[in-house]
Amino acid sequence: TDPMWTADGKYLLFRSSSRGNDKEVESTLPNGEKRKWTPTQIYFIEMATGKIIQATEGPNLGSAFLANKTNRMFVSRKEKENWNMYVMDLDKFFADVKQGKIGKPSAYETFIGTFPTEMGRPGGYAVDCNDDYAYITVEREGTEEEKERMMKNAFLPESNQPVKIKPTLCGIRKMNLSTGEVTKVIDTEFKTGHIQASRFTPGEIVFCNETGGDAHQRMWFCTADGTVFKPLYKETPLDWVTHETFATKDFVYFNVLGFQPRLRKQASGIVRINLRTDDVELIGQVELEKDRQAIDGQLVGRGFWHCNASRDNKWAAGDTFGGNVWLINVQTGERHWLVSDTKMKPDHAHPSFSPDGTKVLFQSGHFTNGKRLNLMMVDISSFK
């Protein structure tokens, strides 16, 4: 859902914790729990050659986000007790790579600012289409009245639905990427996640009520000035919404799951909502007849799981619980079965499109029997 190609289209970004030589480190969570982990680093694939280039190092990398208009990358780092934002000059970095003289990160990174602790505990972020603001999710303390209201309104799942993430008072803040100044956008009374900014219209933000499973209202929309804050696609009790993606200028694509028998009593599949009119359109569903007799809880077959769309609204793509990747012509409804048996582990296929809409990119554990992921790409330029 975030930009993966550099602005000039010459490099593709991915993350990995297994390609480098980083040693396992231990950190302490806010609740005092100890956690061991191997640091994740950012890598780029040069599209013309297939060469893989490591772009970050060290144990303190947070999130990275490619700029929309120039070859830059915004990088957050946890340094001591501070959450710091930097911007990396990728043109300078790639030029040095070609000359075989890569410097330290400090040679390419410029400090932007430190997130103020009084504004909350920062998490994920997205960058506005003009590259001038980062919209950052936060957890916050709030008031006792807010906490009481949050618990009263918290989602109560069916017996076979997980709630892996407990409700938390949260919000969205914005950082000026020129000055480092941080200001409030909105406060929420649910765990706020999966934040995305429009790549086309400044100040439009989509985010979710993150439970790790179903929610009574998953998708939300707000503007960067905080004047608009509303549900996006008002759900019914049988809607299990997931994997929203701010794919195009006027449409947010998402999935309504159909993998449980009770969820099949109404339409499911890849859906899109028009941000200007709130009109909703079902794009398509597949594989619901597969494994109908499977043991309840088996995630095999049973329709789409994740989705994305090309920027011109011509194509939608989705992966299924069975590990297949499908392509749908949004205008005609014609479906193409692109890929089989991605294993959906150690992570899901998560198909997405190149900026020009001619290629579908996805992850696959097929060639490692689900032990490691390969990045795969299918050229769809000949598809009608």
Predicted regions and their residues:
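Asp-box/WD-like beta-propeller blade repeats and closely related beta-sheet repeat scaffolds
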Residues: 57-170, 184-187
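Loop-centered beta-sheet repeat module
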Residues: 182-222, 226-228
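Multi-bladed beta-propeller domains
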Residues: 1, 35, 43-60, 90-120, ...
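Blade-level signature of beta-propeller repeat domains, shared across WD40, Kelch, NHL, RCC1
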Residues: 348-384
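Short, conserved, GDST-rich strand-edge loop motifs in beta-rich repeat architectures
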Residues: 16-37, 78, 84-90, 95, ...
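A short loop-to-beta-strand structural motif that recurs across blades of beta-propeller domains
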Residues: 41-43, 84-86, 171-173, 218-220, ...
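Conserved beta-propeller blade repeats
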Residues: 2-15, 58-77, 113-134, 139, ...
